[in-house]
């Protein structure tokens, strides 16, 4: 598998699956499983029993992980691939479409 170039806090766009076209912020990335949690994308319904933390219990709606291959980095509303470059002796992420430094 290739390296995961998406990081927590990035804005991404879903390019495949039931939520195709939606944009959201990455909440977490799991490089081992090649998945990411994206805010408001791939919502699932979970039934929770009452517990000390959740007195009420009931039906919860939460994000489920989505495969990294189904999302693309979104720069100003357009998808772009991410590359790496060295600027001032530091390795930085670069948008391949525009050449703009991401972080």
Swiss-Prot record:
Coiled coil, from the record: none
Family matches, as InterPro entries: KOW, Rib_uL2_dom2, Ribosomal_uL24, Ribosomal_uL24_CS, Ribosomal_uL24_KOW, Translation_prot_SH3-like_sf
TM spans (from-to): none
GO BP term (any one): translation
Membrane found in the keyword field: no
GO CC annotation, single: ribosome
Covalent S-S links between cysteines: none
UniProt keyword annotations, A-Z: Ribonucleoprotein, Ribosomal protein, RNA-binding, rRNA-binding
Pfam families given in the database record: KOW, ribosomal_L24
SUPFAM superfamilies the record matches: Translation proteins SH3-like domain (SSF50104)
CDD domains: KOW_RPL26
Domain of life: Bacteria
A molecular function (GO) term: structural constituent of ribosome
Alphabetical list of NCBIfam families matching this protein: rplX_bact (TIGR01079)
The protein's assembly and partners: Part of the 50S ribosomal subunit.
Biological function: One of two assembly initiator proteins, it binds directly to the 5'-end of the 23S rRNA, where it nucleates assembly of the 50S subunit.
Family membership: Belongs to the universal ribosomal protein uL24 family.
Protein name according to UniProt: Large ribosomal subunit protein uL24
Source species of the chain: Lachnospira eligens (strain ATCC 27750 / DSM 3376 / VPI C15-48 / C15-B4)
Phylogenetic lineage: Bacteria, Bacillati, Bacillota, Clostridia, Lachnospirales
């Amino acid at each position: 598998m290739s390296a995961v170039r998406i990081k927590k806090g990035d804005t991404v766009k879903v390019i495949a699956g039931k939520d195709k076209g939606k944009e959201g912020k990455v909440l977490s990335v799991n490089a081992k499983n090649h998945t990411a949690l994206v805010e408001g994308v791939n919502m699932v319904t979970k039934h929770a029993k009452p517990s000390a933390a959740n007195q009420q219990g009931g039906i919860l709606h939460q994000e489920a992980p989505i495969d990294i291959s189904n999302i693309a980095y979104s720069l100003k509303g357009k998808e772009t691939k991410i590359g790496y470059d060295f600027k001032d002796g530091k390795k930085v992420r670069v948008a391949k479409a525009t050449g703009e430094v991401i972080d």
